[in-house]
Amino acid sequence: MSRVCQVTGKRPVTGNNRSHALNATKRRFLPNLHSHRFWVEGEKRFVTLRVSAKGMRVIDKKGIEAVLADLRARGEKY
């Protein structure tokens, strides 16, 4: 399973570790992803999404129904 937020599209980015001597070694910054069950009142069922912490805030703001409508419009499965 890829490390991509289903709501915001956040994905890993690359950067450098920097030691005290400023030596650079490659590393990945991973999004703060969680599998979370959301209750969809209109469908009377739970939906499990892999979302970042920001994605959960978006769902709190817009509502799960609106977010699922956006996912359907993009053709994503959930």
Swiss-Prot record:
One Gene Ontology term of the molecular function aspect: structural constituent of ribosome
The keyword NAD is assigned to this record: no
A GO biological-process term: translation
Domain of life: Bacteria
Keywords (A to Z) from UniProt: Ribonucleoprotein, Ribosomal protein
InterPro entries: Ribosomal_bL28, Ribosomal_bL28/bL31-like_sf, Ribosomal_bL28_bact-type, Ribosomal_bL28_sf
Any one Gene Ontology cellular component term annotated for this protein: cytosolic large ribosomal subunit
Family to which this protein belongs: Belongs to the bacterial ribosomal protein bL28 family.
The protein's name: Large ribosomal subunit protein bL28
Gene: rpmB
